[in-house]
Amino acid sequence: MMKKFAVVALVASFGLTACQTQDPYTGEQKTSKATYGALGGAVIGALGGALIGGGDSTDRRQRAMIGAGVGALAGGGIGYYMDKQEAELTQRLRSSGVSVTRVGNDIILNMPGNVTFATDSSDINAKFYDVLNSVAIVLKEYDKTLIDVTGHTDSTGSDQYNLELSQKRAQSVAAYLIGQSVDSRRFYIVGAGEAQPIATNDTPQGREQNRRVEIRLSPLTTS
């Protein structure tokens, strides 16, 4: 129960921060009452259907989506569907800093931490909103996929700090996409901390590569 509460609180904070405006005279950050009521409630409610941490239940998500009337993919249609989705993501994300990689029938989006977040923060950089908006458009168009969002860090800092930061970053990205009307029931959200590096942590360049959020898109099937 406490874990779920912490996630909801984080999403509420993210949603309000994302819609704050700056007073041109005082420089103070302000949030309108409409933002509190509309955005905060919508995002919190949407995230309720997502799976947060723990063991991934692909079957549960598959049943939820198929039960909601989303048709499953089968046979040769799987590869064709993912090919089309990959092509559109590649086109929309060109020059964004986000890489699009195909692994079998899955698609992996790698979002580097240095362009997605400020240092030691889970607040998404405002300049990255347009990139996430493009991702959300494709995810809504291709709704026959499950979405795994995993946060990663480098090895600087304690294991616990890195785990918590990676979780918060994954949740921030997922919350933003859900706030753009991507179905929360498709999501599995987890932080891996420093446990899954893709480069050495012995150099600044390697550590920069390891600080990232990955989105894995898997076809919705009945198996």
Stretches with model-predicted labels:
Residues Q22-E88:
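Short, low-complexity, glycine-enriched hydrophobic/amphipathic alpha-helices that associate
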Residues R92, T116-G151, I178, E208-N210, ...:
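Periplasmic peptidoglycan-binding/anchoring modules of Gram-negative envelope and division proteins
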Residues M82-N114:
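Amphipathic, membrane-active segments
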Residues G15-A18:
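C-terminal motif of bacterial Sec signal peptides marking the signal peptidase cleavage site
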Residues L39, V43, Q85, L89, ...:
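Stable alpha-helical elements in mature extracytoplasmic
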Residues T150-T222:
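Periplasmic OmpA-like peptidoglycan-binding domain that tethers envelope proteins to the cell wall
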Residues G75-G79, T116-I124, D159-N162:
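Second-shell loop/turn segments in exported
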Residues K3-A9:
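Sec-dependent signal peptide recognition
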